Amino acid sequence: MNPTVQELVAALTLEEKAGLCSGADFWHTKAVERLGIPAIKVSDGPHGLRTQREGSTDPNDSIEAVCFPAGCAAAASFDPALTRRMGAALGREARANGVQILLGPAVNIKRSPLCGRNFEYYSEDPYLAGELAAGFINGVQSEGVGTSIKHFAGNDQETRRLSVNSRVDERTLQEIYLPAFETAVKKARPWTVMCSYNRLNGAYASENKPLLTDILRGAWGFDGFVMSDWGAVNDRVKGIAAGLELEMPGSQGVNDRRLIDAVRSGALDEAVLDRAVTRILNIVLLAADLAQRPAAFDRAAHHRLAAELAAQSGVLLRNLGALPLHRGQKVVYIGAYADQPRYQGGGSSHVNTTAVSALDAALLHDRMVQYVEGFPADRDQRDETEFLRAVTAAEAADVAVIFAGLPDSFESEGGDRRHMRLPDCQNNLIARVAAVQKNTVVVLHTGAPVECPWADDVSSVLCMYLAGEGVGEAEDALLWGDADPCGRLPETWPLRLEDTPCYLDFPGDGVTADYREGVYVGYRWYDARRMPVRWPFGHGLSYTGYVYRNAVLSADTLAEQGLVTVQVTVKNSGAMQGAEVVQLYVADTTGTPVAGGRVLQVLRGFQKIALQPGEEQVVTFTLTPRDLSHYDAALHDWYAAPGRYEIRIGHSSRDIRVTLPLHYAGTRLPPLQVDETTPLGILLADPRTAPVVQHALRDETAAMTNGGGDGLMPPEAMAQMFDALTLRNMINFGGPQAEEKLTKLLETLQDAVQ
């Protein structure tokens, strides 16, 4: 009979306990052979296995593996079932290669398009990111391999990521930057969480007790262990006390000794170390047991899956009729990415693989296409001869397809982009080709939005993001109409960098990153400012069409502890099979003031449905009070004001097809701090204090308003001035007894809000 974890912990020496809390090398935990405790192996990455080749001493010498779409592309699928299938495939590959924990998914929020690692991340929206991450984690772990969701938390830039202090207010943190982690933890129970490098509100993530213990374990119920990002530990003793169990990749015994010394000196309670070891061993023994399963995978099948996922993720941004292409047309492919596609980003997630290009796929399917390089893949350099060859070929063709994108040097882990532009050589060629060829198609290979100054001059734009090794086959199917584009944008594409929410603050001064935009990230920002964008969140065109009808709520009113269902019928009104992403947004139209500002609408549901021509399907969503809520920092909890909300269902955040009113019958009211400086407008707007103020200040109100009709001030201005008056201002008109009146009134008001 195998010993229990508790028995193992009791049998370990202090030195062995400390040793189990750090890695043995770059990719392994430590073993304790005398007690039968095995080492386990971890590996990158979130869209393909990057594990060190056996016998190699170079941690970057990786085996060949399947490269699936990066997070930016997978998110465009808007389909957690697809990320689950991708995760399951990665789990099979990991187990076949002796890997017990896969280091992913990465769910940091796309705060700015300039973040160099955006290609790994899912979305600007935490709800979408969380649902996709949960699908991925459930897929990987269904194969007996663990995951490490990362980077927890506030790691939304690469500039000075090892030390920068991300300053985020409580509401913004809880409403934007933590929910994706929360959803994944609650819905998928990842084996591990990886803490980030940065500081969050002054404390390194690796020693941030509110983050690692109070929120992650206390509020969300996480029951795995926390590991550091590679080299992210600042103070090992503080870290283990805060809830960081495993240091990776280890410090060659330096931090082990610090833990031992801290226990012996009394600075660290050995029970805290025992707790960390227990959490690690729970996962290590589970992983070792599941690793006994037979392990194999079909490389060809996984490649086909990668191509399928890439096709499901392609987003048709614009189409005036140039797509789909047809046999018999004279088509020219322009741009080095047609032959050398950019399909993944640089850094720890880089997979050793080979991709099929669009040119390869066209030849395989006997497409009659001409190819001109036009511009290089790896640099911004204009070759005049190639430039003119491309323009000439485009003018002579029926359709010109330009394969554009960002070189690796423009976006990669470790550094942020400096601008949002494509290389000049590409922008110039696109503009010139569009001037001579009305049927110009641009295919984009980027990990994040780029400025598209030529967008109104071309016929069609297809965004592939970084779509993995199957990108060429996917592009071929989408361009030639063998598949319908059904991807949707997981982020807003702004017209220009200056429009972005954190333009003035990203990436900060190198010491501090101030998240001054608050909750206004992505579409929340653009909607609040009624700002035009290039393409909105959730946008994506199709070769077919969809009609929405018969939308209905199960009830007109939502109770405080209740739920309502929303149903809508969606029909494929076109002549081609397709898949629609039905999106549900909630808008708070109660008019209740919200500290930090009210967001106009928030994504609270989405479903991707495949429909044959003429087929229709009823889509159902379920909503609870949490879906109507914002985070209230005074309550330290989620809060929905009673009143009217709108349920908006549509094709994108700015293509709403159906709007339904919903009344929320909540009885809970937010806390209200009352003192002599509280403005009357606030007190009169609150149902608890309004009657008290109206009764107590009748005489003072009359005194203040009697002069309002003498022409000195319009009634509207008088009302605004009255709204701004404080209790002290009003009572001061009461004469000698003002102080006594104020004291009694404050007592009554404070009793009313208890």
Short names for language-model regions:
Residues A665-A685:
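Low-complexity, Pro/Ser/Thr- and charge-rich linker/hinge segments at domain boundaries
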Residues T678-K741:
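Conserved, compact domain cores that house catalytic/ligand-binding motifs in diverse enzymes
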Residues M1-T4, A665, V753-Q754:
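Basic/polar N-terminal segments that are highly enriched at the extreme N-terminus
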Residues M1-S629, R644-I649, S653:
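Glycoside hydrolase catalytic-domain context in secreted enzymes
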Residues T748-Q750:
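Globin-like tetrapyrrole-binding proteins
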Residues P625-R668:
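Terminal connector regions
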Residues T13, K741-L745:
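Acyl-CoA thioester-binding alpha/beta core of soluble enzymes
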